[in-house]
Amino acid sequence: MVKIIGKGGANYVLAFGNDNDDLYRICVRGRSLRENNRSTVDNYHYALEVVKPQLGEFVCRMELVDLPVCDSLRQVLKSKIEVWDATTVTCLKMPNLVPAGSLSHTVDHFTKIHIGERAIVWEFKPKWLSGNDKYCRNCTLNLLRGQTSISYCHAQLLNPGQAGPILKSLFAGLNVPPAFIEDMEAYIAQPCSVLQRLRVAQEQVDASLGPLDQPDTAASPERCLSMTLKDVSCFVSWHKDASPVAVVVDLDMKPAAKSAHWTALQEQLDRFQPQVRH
């Protein structure tokens, strides 16, 4: 039996049978299975050869595997794949980062928490952590999109003294022990934390880029890497008697064809009012 664990615009994440340890990430961006298989291979090499030098040990362990096309795979993928022009489905096999039997809570558009008997996993998309002297890109975009219920951004967690209050507010009403909040606050402040490392990586890549409205950089490989780093997902696993462990996923190369969209959105944000500053 095949179960869909997660759906995105370009990928499905599947589980097979009673195997709770491994998940299989399949590209569904194109209508052709062969095309999607090639994209999966390309994304695998991109993650290891381009993104991993930026994020190091935080990059999730993964391997390429080919699964024979079967009826159950056809069933779960039929709404996305129209042309079955290959006999196997190429997948990224990855560890399941959510504890078996845990209770999952969607906190908001960017944050989930998974509470298990022995571990708590904080899942989040930090988005833009690199600096913008004019306004907060994350919070201003939330207002532009009408997401007014989200009163924080992950960039604020890196400001001294703000992580604790934000985390307490974020997980209020959920069954998380005070030690989880305390340990996460201390972890975020460490130079080796995933948020700190991701911010440094974003800043280093962005330092070589001009404004988004410059045609020579809007679709460059460096711009695509910058956008990949701003759309990753982080999983931070917490155990009571151990240091937090972080893993980063969603490392696909962003298509250069989106450069016009990136430029238009940036221009829209620059005109939008009110812009959020903090």
From Swiss-Prot:
Enzyme class at the top of the EC tree: transferase
Recorded hits in InterPro entries, A to Z, give: Ins_P5_2-kin
Q: What is its main location?
A: nucleus
**So what EC number does this one have?**
2.7.1.158
Residues of the signal peptide: none
Q: Which UniProt keywords apply?
A: ATP-binding, Kinase, Nucleotide-binding, Nucleus, Transferase
Short motif (EXKPK motif): ranges:
123-127
GO cellular component assignments: nucleus
Q: Keyword check for ATP-binding, yes or no.
A: yes
BP terms from Gene Ontology? inositol phosphate biosynthetic process
Q: Which residues form a coiled coil?
A: none
Q: Which domain of life is it from?
A: Eukaryota
The listed locations are: Nucleus
Which reaction is this enzyme known to catalyze? 1D-myo-inositol 1,3,4,5,6-pentakisphosphate + ATP = 1D-myo-inositol hexakisphosphate + ADP + H(+)
GO MF, one example: inositol-1,3,4,5,6-pentakisphosphate 2-kinase activity
- PANTHER family assigned to the protein according to its UniProt record, in alphabetical order: INOSITOL POLYPHOSPHATE KINASE 1, INOSITOL-PENTAKISPHOSPHATE 2-KINASE
Domain description: The EXKPK motif is conserved in inositol-pentakisphosphate 2-kinases of both family 1 and 2.
What is the purpose of this protein?
Has kinase activity and phosphorylates inositol-1,3,4,5,6-pentakisphosphate (Ins(1,3,4,5,6)P5) to produce 1,2,3,4,5,6-hexakisphosphate (InsP6), also known as phytate.
Task: Indicate what this protein is called per its UniProt record.
Answer: Inositol-pentakisphosphate 2-kinase
Q: Which organism is it from?
A: Eremothecium gossypii (strain ATCC 10895 / CBS 109.51 / FGSC 9923 / NRRL Y-1056)
Q: Which gene encodes it?
A: IPK1
